[in-house]
Swiss-Prot record:
Pathway: Cofactor biosynthesis; pyrroloquinoline quinone biosynthesis. Keywords: 4Fe-4S, Iron, Iron-sulfur, Metal-binding, Oxidoreductase, PQQ biosynthesis, S-adenosyl-L-methionine. It comes from Klebsiella pneumoniae (strain 342). This is PqqA peptide cyclase. GO terms for biological process: pyrroloquinoline quinone biosynthetic process. It catalyses: [PQQ precursor protein] + S-adenosyl-L-methionine = E-Y cross-linked-[PQQ precursor protein] + 5'-deoxyadenosine + L-methionine + H(+). Coiled coil: none annotated. One of its GO terms (molecular function) is S-adenosyl-L-methionine binding. Interacts with PqqD. The interaction is necessary for activity of PqqE.
Length: 380
C-alpha cells in the first residue's frame, strides 16, 4: 500500500435511493438525466439485505431518498428493518404523498427524522418550480403534522436565481412553521441542475445579499431566543478553493441507486468508471476492494497542482464529478480551484450568470418524457 494512501474506514452514512419515481418536476433535481432508463428497483428483501450488510460494516445513519421515497409502499417495512438493525433513520421527502396516517405508521416503525423540501416561500413560484399547483399547501400541512408528532422540524429550500431574493420570506415561513433546522442550500450543479445551470446559478450580488439576510436573521433570532438553526450553503462556483466533496472519495458516504448500483456519491454514476452492483458483490467487497471505490481514494491519483498542494488533505482535490462535467476528465483538478488550469470554466459560468435572462418557464424540467428524449437524442 502506498504511504500516501490512508487506511479505509467503514461507510458511516448510507443513502438508499429507493426509487427515481417522483410526482414533482424540479429543474434542479440531482437525479441522473437518463433516470427514465432505470426501470428496475430493488425488492424489499434486497434493500433489507443491503441495510444488514452496511450495519455490519459499521454504518450508523441511513437516509431514505429518491425520487420520492413515499412512492414505495414498503417504506414502513424498510424503516422498521433499519430501526431494528440499529440505524438512525432519516426520510428525505417532498411531502407529496405524505399523510397523517403514514406519519403515524412511520413513527410506529421507528423513523427518527423527517426532512421536507420546499421550492419557494409562496404558492405561485413553488408551483412553477415543482410542476404541481397543489404542492405548496400539501407541504405546509405535512410540515405542521410532522411538528405535531414531535419529530425534529427540518426544512430544506434549494436556492437559485429565481427564489434567492425572497430569502427573507423563506426564513419567515420557517419561523412560522417552528422549524428546528433549516437548510438553505444553494443549488449544487449536478444532474438536472447542471443542465439548467445558466438559468439557475445566482449572481455574485445575489449571493452577497443572501449572506447578509441570513446573518441579520441569525442575529435577530438569537436576540429573541429563537433557537432555529439556519444552515446556508453557498455554491462553490463563487469560491476559489473546492469543497472537500463527501469528506473524501469512498471515505464516509455510500449511496445505492434504485436498481442496486453502489456509488461513492450520488452523482458518480455519470463517470466513465464501472461501479458494482449490490446484487453481484457484497457491500464489504464493494467498499474495500472494488476499482470504482478505490479509483480516487487517497492522494496517489492526483495530478499537479493537486499532488504537491498543501491543501490536499482538506479538499481531497475537490469534486471528481464536477471535474468530469466541466473538463471531460474526472482526473483533472476541480475547476473551482483558482490553481486549476481549468478555472476559466468557472469564470465563464459566472459571466453567464451575470447576464442570464432565462425565466422559470424556460428551464428544462425533470420528468420522464424529457429524460427519455435526452437519452434518445444522445444515442443518435
Amino acid at each position: 500500500m502506498s504511504q500516501n494512501k490512508p487506511a479505509v474506514n467503514p461507510p458511516l452514512w448510507l443513502l438508499a435511493e429507493l426509487t427515481y419515481r417522483c410526482p414533482l418536476q424540479c429543474p434542479y433535481c440531482s437525479n441522473p438525466l437518463d433516470f427514465a432508463r432505470q426501470e428496475k428497483e430493488l425488492t424489499t428483501e434486497q434493500w433489507i439485505e443491503v441495510f444488514r450488510q452496511a450495519r455490519a460494516m459499521g454504518s450508523v445513519q441511513l437516509g431514505f431518498s429518491g425520487g420520492e421515497p413515499l412512492t414505495r409502499k414498503d417504506l414502513p417495512e424498510l424503516i422498521r428493518a433499519a430501526r431494528d438493525l440499529g440505524f438512525y433513520t432519516n426520510l428525505i421527502t417532498s411531502g407529496i404523498g405524505l399523510t397523517e396516517s403514514k406519519l403515524d405508521a412511520f413513527s410506529e416503525a421507528g423513523l427518527d427524522h423527517i426532512q421536507i423540501s420546499f421550492q419557494a416561500s409562496d404558492e405561485v413560484l413553488n408551483a412553477a418550480l415543482a410542476g404541481n399547483k397543489k404542492a405548496f399547501q400539501q407541504k405546509l400541512a405535512m410540515a405542521r403534522a410532522v411538528k405535531a408528532r414531535d419529530y425534529p422540524m427540518v426544512l430544506n429550500f434549494v436556492l437559485h436565481r429565481h427564489n434567492i431574493d425572497q430569502l427573507d420570506k423563506i426564513i419567515e415561513l420557517c419561523i412560522e412553521l417552528e422549524a428546528d433546522d433549516v437548510e438553505l442550500a444553494t443549488c449544487q450543479f449536478y444532474g438536472w441542475a447542471f443542465l439548467n445551470r445558466e438559468g439557475l446559478l445566482p449572481t455574485r450580488e445575489q449571493i452577497a445579499r443572501a449572506e447578509q439576510v441570513v446573518a441579520d436573521y441569525r442575529q435577530k433570532m438569537a436576540a429573541s431566543g429563537n433557537l432555529t438553526n439556519l444552515l446556508f450553503v453557498t455554491p462553490d462556483y463563487y469560491e476559489e478553493r473546492p469543497k472537500g466533496c463527501m469528506g473524501g472519495w469512498g471515505s464516509i458516504f455510500l449511496s445505492v441507486t434504485p436498481e442496486g448500483t453502489a456509488l461513492p456519491c450520488h452523482s458518480a454514476r455519470q463517470l466513465p468508471v464501472a461501479f458494482p452492483s449490490v446484487l453481484e458483490q457484497s457491500l464489504e467487497s464493494i467498499w474495500y476492494d472494488s476499482f470504482g471505490f478505490n479509483r480516487y481514494r487517497g492522494y496517489d491519483w492526483m495530478p499537479e497542482p493537486c499532488r504537491s498542494c498543501d491543501e490536499k488533505e482538506k479538499d481531497f482535490g475537490g469534486c471528481r464529478c464536477q471535474a468530469f462535467m466541466l473538463t471531460g476528465s474526472a482526473d483533472n483538478a476541480d475547476p473551482v480551484c483558482s490553481k486549476s488550469p481549468h478555472h476559466h470554466k468557472i469564470l465563464e459560468a459566472r459571466r453567464e450568470a451575470a447576464c442570464s435572462d432565462i425565466k422559470v418557464s424556460q428551464l428544462q424540467f425533470r420528468n420522464r418524457t424529457r429524460s427519455q428524449l435526452i437519452y434518445k437524442t444522445r444515442e443518435l
